[in-house]
Structure formats: structure tokens, C-alpha cells
């Protein structure tokens, strides 16, 4: 996604440097949404995982999303880039990418919070057992119950 790209876009530079074409599908959901969801699942309201402006009234990072243009960034590094806001645009971008001879980035717009469920998977992350937040202590109790259900063979 866009969060991972911000940490690892240097891999694209390596592909350009070595003239080894790769096609990058960048799902832009305005932040580290899987971590944001994990925070909320554990009783937090979330902090710092969405690319938002600070709200001038509250002082919190709950303002408008930053207008980051990852396709323009990739192009500035020398890659070919496309944006896809619809399924048809994505199909068109994929066909164009297939015919390119250099690295391609396709920025795909995704609505925040529209990810899939965990499909019975579980990310065992520590949760404080003591907190002034009832949501956090409830999340801690859910974690304890889940751990009690695990049977290791």
C-alpha cells in the first residue's frame, strides 16, 4: 500500500538503476490502514497511521487526508505511472503496463476502512491489562480468551 511504498520506494529506484522492469500496484488507502484497524481492535482510537492534516480545532490528526500523489512521485524518479480510480481504469493501466519496457507504478484508489476481514486469522499483539479506557481493558479480556482457546500440538 501507500504506507509501505513510503518506506520502500528505494526498491523501485534499484529496478530503474538496474534496468529490471517491475510493475508496482500501489493501493492508496491514505495510510497504514491495517495498523490503524489493529489499533482500533485493541481499544485505541488510533494514532498516526493515517496521512491526515492536524485538525486546528482539536489538535488531533483527524483533518483532511494529505493530497499525496504517488504516481507523480514515481514518475519523478523515472518510472512510468498511471492512476486508477475505477475498475476500467485499472484494466487499462494494467494493459499499458504490460507493454512498457521500464518500471511501472499503478496508483489504485481504495477507500479507507474497506479492507477484508481477517478470515479467522489473528494477530497476537499485547494489550495493556490495566487502563483507564474501558475499550482497552475489554480488548485485553478478549485477547486472554482467545489465547485460552489456542491448542498447540
Predicted feature residues:
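Thiamine diphosphate
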Residues: 1-153
Amino acid at each position: 500500500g501507500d504506507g509501505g511504498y513510503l518506506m520502500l520506494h528505494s526498491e523501485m529506484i534499484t529496478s530503474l538503476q538496474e534496468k529490471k522492469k517491475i510493475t508496482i500496484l500501489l493501493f492508496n488507502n491514505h495510510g497504514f490502514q491495517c495498523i490503524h484497524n489493529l489499533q482500533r481492535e485493541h481499544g485505541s482510537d488510533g494514532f498516526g497511521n493515517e496521512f491526515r492534516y492536524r485538525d486546528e480545532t482539536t489538535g488531533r490528526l483527524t483533518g483532511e487526508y494529505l493530497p499525496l500523489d504517488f504516481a507523480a512521485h514515481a514518475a519523478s524518479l523515472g518510472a512510468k505511472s498511471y492512476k486508477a480510480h475505477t475498475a476500467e481504469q485499472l484494466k487499462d493501466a494494467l494493459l499499458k503496463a504490460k507493454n512498457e519496457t521500464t518500471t511501472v507504478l499503478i496508483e489504485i484508489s481504495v477507500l479507507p476502512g474497506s479492507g477484508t476481514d481477517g478470515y479467522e486469522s489473528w494477530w497476537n499483539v499485547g494489550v495493556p491489562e490495566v487502563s483507564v479506557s474501558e475499550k482497552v481493558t475489554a480488548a485485553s479480556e478478549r485477547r486472554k480468551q482467545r489465547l485460552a482457546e489456542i491448542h498447540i500440538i
